[in-house]
Amino acid sequence: MKHRYLPATEQDKKEMLKAIGAETIDELFADIPENVRFQKDYQIKKAKSETELTRELTKLAAKNKDAVTYASFLGAGVYDHYQPVIVDHVISRSEFYTAYTPYQPEISQGELQAIFEFQTMICELTGMDIANSSMYDGGTALAEAAMLASGHTKKKKIVISAAVHPESRDVLKTYAKGQYIEVVEVPAKNGVTDLEALEHAVCDETAAVIVQYPNFFGQIEPLKDIEPLAHKGNSQLIVSSNPLALGILTPPGAYGADIVVGDAQPFGIPAAFGGPHCGYFAVTKKLMRKVPGRLVGQTEDENGRRGFVLTLQAREQHIRRDKATSNICSNQALNALAASAAMTALGKNGVKDMARQNILKADYARRQAEKAGLHVAFDGPIFNEFAVRLNLPVKEANRRLLQDGIIGGYDLGLAYPELNQHMLIAVTELRTKEKIDSLIARLGDQHE
């Protein structure tokens, strides 16, 4: 174990060069012209012992401002939620942790059952008939939903609310460009989709209408009013939803949604820089054969024993590449398992209580903000986020908050120029009354 971190020692290199008949490394790469070779010093630091390396990395990690040491009010699509301890124990089991898409499902029954349970729980939350095994993230799921709607309706226009997550809208535009699909954005009014503008935007050429519930500003969109407008001209209604919110809100399926997508990050997946996340994708039965990604089904073997299989695989790229419903050929099975473990540990009542705490704490924070003289940007019901207008740049406000051990909210001006100096504040079940009061007090002091 003397050289356990070295892929090849000097002796190893000599033996390999001898085996291929080369004297030196330069001789090995003789076919590469001198003028294109990298000639500079790599500037790699001198090797360290394991103890020295651990000490250096620990010192670097201490520079991070994490949600354990600091009270985080940053959301905007990634949230600091309670993670049941059991989640890491479940996903760390070797039979799950090292597993990839089970192409031999008959020998991966545990993996398939775990995915099947994930699909079942997503269906219960969304009120939909069928859910797939997962997608890369919420943005990818939304874009894939738009592609499904376009293919199903044979139309090339997608209408999307400006109150949908800006990064999801960017992903959609990337997908749409290659498919020659027109993306039309409908403005928001008082924090929710402008219904009058939506009505004017939808026409006979519209494949789908996309809204977010709760939306990017934390507001609860009026799906009951949006549904008839969305279905005008036989277009599809796509709803992007925070799955935790669906533990207490009326599910999109009850309002007539055709496709419900979102990100399962609130369940068992920590807020980490860049992910990974876990998208979910649920549809009505009529769209079952057009769903992207893997589908796990329950069946019986010849002896009557329950079993699980990958079903309807003719939709998939590895079976019929030229006629596949999507070019997505993988999923986030491990993160889907984490979400399943978290939802199972919480139970139905636990999910509902967790969602209720988000609503109550965010509402308390919003009321306290108003009392402190802060301008709350939008009226109407919210889930766990709300926007306030500040008298100084959000970046500066967050710098000051950080000095007091608080990670502030998202700068809405980054995505919405008209909302310059507006901060989007997220309040989850982990934030205490003391920390909420501390945040509002400091923002109030800065506001004066």
UniProtKB/Swiss-Prot annotation:
CDD domains: GDC-P. GO terms for molecular function: glycine dehydrogenase (decarboxylating) activity. The keyword Oxidoreductase applies. Its EC number is 1.4.4.2. GO terms for biological process: glycine decarboxylation via glycine cleavage system; nucleoside metabolic process. It catalyses: N(6)-[(R)-lipoyl]-L-lysyl-[glycine-cleavage complex H protein] + glycine + H(+) = N(6)-[(R)-S(8)-aminomethyldihydrolipoyl]-L-lysyl-[glycine-cleavage complex H protein] + CO2. InterPro entries: GcvPA, GDC-P_N, GDC_P, PyrdxlP-dep_Trfase, PyrdxlP-dep_Trfase_major, PyrdxlP-dep_Trfase_small. The keyword Transferase does not apply. Keywords: Oxidoreductase. SUPFAM superfamilies: PLP-dependent transferases. The glycine cleavage system is composed of four proteins: P, T, L and H. In this organism, the P 'protein' is a heterodimer of two subunits. The glycine cleavage system catalyzes the degradation of glycine. The P protein binds the alpha-amino group of glycine through its pyridoxal phosphate cofactor; CO(2) is released and the remaining methylamine moiety is then transferred to the lipoamide cofactor of the H protein. Belongs to the GcvP family. N-terminal subunit subfamily. This is Probable glycine dehydrogenase (decarboxylating) subunit 1. It comes from Bacillus velezensis (strain DSM 23117 / BGSC 10A6 / LMG 26770 / FZB42) (Bacillus amyloliquefaciens subsp. plantarum). The gene is gcvPA.
